[in-house]
Regions:
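Paired small-residue
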Residues: 85, 89-92, 100-108, 305-313
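Helix-breaking motifs and short loop linkers at transmembrane-helix boundaries and internal kinks
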Residues: 42, 74, 95-101, 112, ...
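Cytoplasmic helix-loop-helix junction between adjacent transmembrane helices
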Residues: 105-146
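Conserved MFS/SLC helix-loop-helix module at the cytosolic interface between two early adjacent transmembrane helices
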Residues: 61-99
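C-terminal membrane-cytosol helix-exit motif in multi-pass small-molecule transporters
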Residues: 173-192, 386-389
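Juxtamembrane intracellular "pre-TM" segments in multi-pass secondary transporters
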Residues: 2-6, 187-218
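A late C-terminal transmembrane helix in Major Facilitator Superfamily
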Residues: 326-365, 374-375
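Helix-loop-helix hairpin linking two adjacent transmembrane segments in secondary transporters
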Residues: 101, 138-183, 252
Length: 404
């Protein structure tokens, strides 16, 4: 088995960082191309939006279990196989004229990305420790957040210059190059292989999901992420078909949306010592005000320049709420931090996909007003689940005090 050579350690680390945002790139890069795909494949907008959902659901479910596979069979061989599968499936999508073939390949890509990303996160745990490990892991969220910023920007230009298939050629070429570099400079990072045990994993997951405050926090962050997905699924059709702007403009809009989400996360870190209940209550109140104002404004005038400011404000607050409660979920089970991370990331993808696609399917989002209605529905659900979360958290804290 090929192991990482000491002189290639730095290159392996750079390659690992390069693959962490792959899940975001695999969805966000072709968001500006959704209208073109629907037209070329002669299918409805919801049919091409389903390609996003299938990818995220397969990636989310896979994240729940691939950690144990990687611990049992190693990171390197599974990672190389996943990169090869992703590259080939990207080529098939680009060449395919069938939406059903694209569906199948997106599921393959979701599973592949789960193996790649989880394996690369584990690489850092295998190779580093102490302050070095802390420094590297602190960069994960920042690097992951680059995808919704950079990918739509690239995708908009690819769509305008070469068409929708070029996005998948780009993804395939990217993973092919990284895969070849992995073959030359990479290697197995796992020191000790573990036997694969399925039943104990399920038991731990069941125990976590029975913890009410954890599960409710997980639902809330899924609703926050669903806001970004709803915008990603619908904004290209509004911007390109209703406002008559180019795919490049749709790409820039998604870029700004990603920046707003990142700023919200940064603000949350600066307020880490503030009361969780107070700051989330204020944040949800602001989101309600922004969503209602977005709907009212659309009754008088609607354009790209009236829609995007409201979107950015809502997404900034969503990033704030998301970061606070995502941290809460990860810290809720300190003794099983790895499993908590897997279940939080995996189920968040699955639930956010169902929330967003279900809402897009029920609400015909073809205007600023209807996008505002979709946001209002999501914020109202966040408010309801946060009230339930507050009560569950208070009950759990009271129980701990009574036992002590």
């Amino acid at each position: 088995m090929q192991h990482i050579k000491e002189q290639y350690q730095q290159i392996s680390t750079i390659l690992s960082f390069a693959l962490i945002p792959l899940s975001g790139f695999a969805t966000d890069i072709y968001i500006p191309s959704l209208p073109s795909m629907a037209s070329h494949l002669q299918v409805s907008s919801s049919a091409v939006q389903l390609t996003l959902v299938l990818f995220m659901v397969s990636a989310g479910i896979s994240q729940l279990f691939v950690g144990s596979l990687l611990d049992s069979f190693g990171r390197y061989r599974l990672g190389i196989a996943a990169l090869a599968a992703f590259t080939l499936s990207s080529a098939v999508i680009a060449l395919s004229g069938s939406i059903y073939m694209i569906y199948a390949m997106r599921i393959v890509q979701g599973i592949s990305v789960a193996l790649i990303v989880v394996g690369k996160r584990a690489y850092f745990m295998d190779r580093f420790s102490g302050d070095t490990l802390k420094n590297y892991t602190s960069l994960f969220s920042i690097i992951w957040a680059t995808a919704p910023i950079i990918a739509p920007f690239i995708g908009g230009y690819l769509q305008s210059s070469f068409g929708w298939a070029s996005n998948f050629y780009f993804l395939g070429l990217l993973t092919l190059v990284i895969g070849l570099l992995e073959l030359k400079y990479g290697g197995e990072s796992l020191g000790q292989f573990q036997p694969f045990k399925f039943k104990p994993i399920i038991q731990v997951y069941q125990s976590m999901l029975k913890t009410t405050d954890f599960t409710l926090a997980l639902v809330i962050i899924s609703l926050c992420y669903a806001m970004l997905l709803v915008f990603g699924m619908t904004s290209p059709f509004i911007i390109e078909h209703v406002f008559h702007y180019s795919p490049v403009a749709a790409g820039y809009s998604s870029l700004l949306s990603g920046v707003a989400l990142m700023i919200g996360g940064i603000i949350s870190k600066s307020m880490i010592r503030k009361s969780l209940t107070k700051k989330i209550t204020v944040a949800i109140s602001l989101q309600l005000a922004f969503a209602i104002s977005m709907i009212i404004t659309a009754g008088y005038y609607s354009s790209l320049y009236t829609m995007i400011p409201f979107v950015l404000a809502i997404h900034l607050v969503a990033g704030f709420v998301f970061n606070n409660l995502f941290s809460y979920c990860l810290g809720r089970f300190s003794k099983n931090a790895g499993i908590a991370s897997g279940i939080t990331g995996g189920l968040m993808y699955v639930m956010a996909s169902f929330f967003s696609y279900g809402l897009v399917d029920m609400v015909n989002i073809k205007s600023q007003a209807m996008l505002g209605v979709a946001y209002l529905v999501l914020v109202t659900l966040i408010l309801i689940f946060f009230i339930l979360f507050y009560r569950a958290r208070y009950a759990a804290t009271s129980l701990q005090w009574s036992r002590s």
